[in-house]
Amino acid sequence: SRLPAALRETIGRYFRDQVAVDPDHEFVVYPDRALRWTYKEFDERTDNLARGLLAIGMRPGDHLGVWARNIPDWLTFMYATAKIGVVMVTVNPVYKSHELDYVLKQSDMKALCVIDAYRDVDYLKIIRDLVPETLTQQRGYLESENYPFLKNIIYMGPEKHRAAIACRSSCCWEAMCERRW
């Protein structure tokens, strides 16, 4: 190929090479959370999440939305979706109800990952209002009249808020990351 080597390189391939070359080197650092992951730790975490996404029915080409501010989980979803060929749809963290409604209808999202809130935006309330089925349907079997592609809500947050989005109908982030097949 006539392309320079740097243009032929993918982020995934570069990341895998770094894991092989220097697995114990820090890759993710969030000082405000006292969080540090090495290449190896992050690789394992994203592999586990990728397996969890496959287990809930995500397939190459499917769209997964992430509605969150800049947090470690956002980065984890970015790499996990790339590993399995799922398209990550980033949702602006300051979007309100009408904007999320538009994105859900236009993006064919099969799953939406959310945190509880950001600034003055209560994500969980917006989800309950837009997708009331989350309050009555079982986890993993979401059938929404307004969003026919949407099958799962994945909540990334503290256990104390799980009931706010009816855990019966949402996939739990920690459970997905901890699964090992």
Locate the predicted segments by residue.
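Short, flexible loop segments at the rims of nucleotide/cofactor-binding pockets, characterized by
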Residues: 3-6, 41, 89-92
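Conserved AMP-binding/adenylate-forming core of the ANL superfamily
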Residues: 27-79, 98-101, 169-175, 180
